[in-house]
Amino acid sequence: MTSKPMNRRPTANNHRNRSPETAKKLGQLHPRNPHQGRYDFEVLTRALPELAKHTITNPKGESTINFSDSAAVRVLNQALLANYYGVKFWDIPEGYLCPPIPGRADYIHYIADLLAQTTHVNKDNTPPTGKEIHALDIGTGASAIYPIVGSQSYGWRFTASDIDPISVNTAALICETNPKLKSAVKVKLQTEPKFIFKNIIGRQDYFDVVVCNPPFHASLEEAMEANSRKQHNLQRHRGKNENEQISRSSTKPGNAAQNLNFGGQHKELWSEGGEIAFLTKMAKESQDFAEHVGWFTTLVSKSENVKPLQLLLKQLGVAQMRIIEMSQGQKSTRILAWRFNTDEE
């Protein structure tokens, strides 16, 4: 049974009557995404009273937080997860990625549309719900955000994998501590980092969809340069839409000597060759698991990587490929989806 968001604040526009296409044109979140407009701090503070310690008033007299304060952003995430997804315990180690929940939720809702339009078509065009839908999250991190959003929004089952033992242990603890997640999410350690699907997808496994938010930097230096730009943009956009702000700043600082102002371990933020190398490996390996997955999908943060990946997928003989654009304020990104079989259509 689908878990419904709790205490969602009404917005001025009837976002549930918008189409996803309209939302993208307007730079807005997916119509089913509950994180529309400004955060309702009164509601969120009721869900997590600790948030009151971090709430401030902006020059317009509106409640907000200091989005440059990693502790405040972390508590805001805890409040969002408690209020909208019923997650009572959520915490991550120092130095690990604290993700922007509104943007992460958008990915899941667009994937639900993809399934509704292709492999799980309902007469009323509603997204498929329930534990018969099994999703695989590649690189779940310590936060397990995609399994949380997907299981609590649509009732799906998730297998979540990562190459980092601390991430796996933390994500598993989050899921085991929350009754709503315990039976819905299984966390697995990838013991051979050179592989993405091998060791994770078993011979008897079938996943309706794979989701992935890949490392997007090729080196620590590139990650640091991106962080510098992000901090500049955070200052420049101060006072604008809060969902956009959290997408720029909602990460926890690490312990590295470089003193990066965002969270994320090496494995979360950068890998040799960057995003294109990781996704090239993912695409090639997906061919070996074509019979085990309905749709392979991934975020592609760099637009210049889309065409090379499309060309590669054509060479690999995929049966169908889609680019799903997402827009959140001034930030645009996209989902690349492909599959090798279309027998279910």
From Swiss-Prot:
Pfam families: Methyltransf_10. Coiled coil: none annotated. Residues 229-239 have a biased composition (Basic residues). GO terms for cellular component: cytoplasm. SUPFAM superfamilies: S-adenosyl-L-methionine-dependent methyltransferases (SSF53335). It comes from the Bacteria. It catalyses: adenosine(1618) in 23S rRNA + S-adenosyl-L-methionine = N(6)-methyladenosine(1618) in 23S rRNA + S-adenosyl-L-homocysteine + H(+). Residues 1-14, 246-261 have a biased composition (Polar residues). Its EC number is 2.1.1.181. GO terms for molecular function: 23S rRNA (adenine(1618)-N(6))-methyltransferase activity; nucleic acid binding. One of its GO terms (biological process) is rRNA base methylation. Residues 1-35, 225-261 are annotated as: Disordered. Keywords: Cytoplasm, Methyltransferase, rRNA processing, S-adenosyl-L-methionine, Transferase. Its main location: cytoplasm. It is found in: Cytoplasm. InterPro entries: DNA_methylase_N6_adenine_CS, METTL16/RlmF, rRNA_lsu_MeTfrase_F, SAM-dependent_MTases_sf. PANTHER family: RNA N6-ADENOSINE-METHYLTRANSFERASE METTL16, SAM-DEPENDENT METHYLTRANSFERASE. Specifically methylates the adenine in position 1618 of 23S rRNA. Belongs to the methyltransferase superfamily. METTL16/RlmF family. This is Ribosomal RNA large subunit methyltransferase F.
